[in-house]
A protein has these predicted regions:
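N-terminal secretory signal peptides that target proteins for export/translocation
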Residues: 1-13
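Short, linear, compositionally biased motifs with a strong N-terminal bias
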Residues: 10, 23-24
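Intrinsically disordered, low-complexity sequence elements enriched in Ser/Thr/Gly/Pro
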Residues: 13-14, 33
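Sec-dependent signal peptide hydrophobic core
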Residues: 17-22, 57
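Cleavable N-terminal signal peptides
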Residues: 20-21, 30-32
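Acidic, metal/ion-coordinating pockets
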Residues: 31-179
Length: 179
């Protein structure tokens, strides 16, 4: 197992830098160039691959599950092909199927969603550091992270803390940080 360092100071500094950069970028945009962008966002999926009853919503109707999520994403992308789908992490830990497969079933299911980028959450480490790295290799979408390091602050675990997507003439930066 490798040592893991996540610096809160670095997260704070990065947030300030991002806000400054974003403000600087916006100051050069013409108001006549306004475009609409749809961002679909998931987080804390917690391996709920199958629908379940949520009694606070309905005593009888099942909700959620990856099949329902995939249907919603597909419908939105048919209506709006430039929509972006991102996930903020915590997709491994949850019902028995994730535990039995140590996250493998979750990554395989996520590959069908058409995710543009995802981050790592704390629950991706629930089955161990080495297992998490092994499962993440199977992801068919970019895993982004700019503040998880191998044995010190100089070597990031992932080579890509960010990506830049292009949609309808827009360049969109997506940065991954572990909270």
């Amino acid at each position: 197992m490798k040592n893991l360092f996540i610096s809160g100071t670095q997260v704070s500094m990065l947030k300030k830098t991002l806000i400054t950069t974003f403000t600087f970028f916006l100051s050069f945009q013409s108001l006549t160039e306004v475009k609409e962008l749809t961002i679909l966002h998931t987080n804390d999926l917690h391996a709920h691959l199958f629908p379940r009853i949520a009694p606070w919503i309905s005593e009888s109707r099942k909700i959620g599950g990856f099949a329902n999520l995939a249907t919603l994403v597909k419908q939105e992308k048919q209506f709006n092909p430039s929509a972006i789908l991102i996930d903020a992490g915590d997709y491994f830990s949850g019902p028995y199927l994730s535990t039995l497969t140590e996250g493998e079933a979750v990554i395989k299911s996520m590959n069908y969603l058409g995710i543009d980028a995802a981050c790592i959450g704390n629950h991706e480490f629930d089955h161990g550091w080495d297992n998490m790295l092994e499962q993440i290799k199977e992801a068919e979408f970019p895993i982004l992270n700019g503040n998880i390091f191998y044995e010190g602050p100089d070597k990031l675990v992932w080579d890509n803390p960010y990506i830049i997507l292009e949609r309808e003439g827009l360049r969109i930066g997506i940065i991954g940080l572990h909270g």
